[in-house]
Amino acid sequence: MHDFCFTIPYGILLIVGGFIGYLKKGSIASLAGGAGTGLLVVLAGFISLKAFEKKKTSLLATLLETVIAAALTFVMGQRFLQTQKIMPAALVAGISALMTCFYVYKIATGGNHIPPKAE
């Protein structure tokens, strides 16, 4: 599975979560954190998709995705430990931890594999 197949939906989920946090609680931190990280993740996914279309890999995009997902895992994990609230801290930490593992796997296996041309 290519990283952008999960990255773009993950980024959209972060953006939507940031907006929901802002609408429900008026939290500017949720809006900035969710929308900011979500936009960066979507951008990295888009860069990875465009590289794949050119039959190249984008290590930089995958590294950016990994750093963001790992940071969200840590920050939201700490928040969960302090508040014990499943929504949104544990949910975001859990999804981000899964994404971090996926990205580390993609980096370890050489990124998106480009299928050979059929002749």
Swiss-Prot record:
Annotated membrane topology: Multi-pass membrane protein
Record's keyword terms, sorted: Membrane, Transmembrane, Transmembrane helix
Keyword Nuclease on entry: no
Superkingdom of origin: Eukaryota
Keyword Membrane: yes
GO biological processes: cellular response to hypoxia
Gene3D superfamilies (UniProt xref): Transmembrane protein 14-like
Cellular compartments annotated: Membrane
GO cellular component: membrane
Transmembrane segments annotated in the record for this chain: 27-47, 57-77, 85-105
Family: Belongs to the TMEM14 family.
Primary role: May be involved in free fatty acids export.
Leftover remarks: For all TMEM14 proteins, 4 hydrophobic alpha-helical domains are predicted. However, NMR structure determination of the human TMEM14A showed that only 3 of these helices are membrane-spaning while the amphiphilic N-terminal helix is probably located at the lipid micelle-water interface.
Name of the protein this chain belongs to: Protein FATTY ACID EXPORT 5
Organism: Arabidopsis thaliana
Lineage of the species this protein comes from: Eukaryota, Viridiplantae, Streptophyta, Embryophyta, Tracheophyta
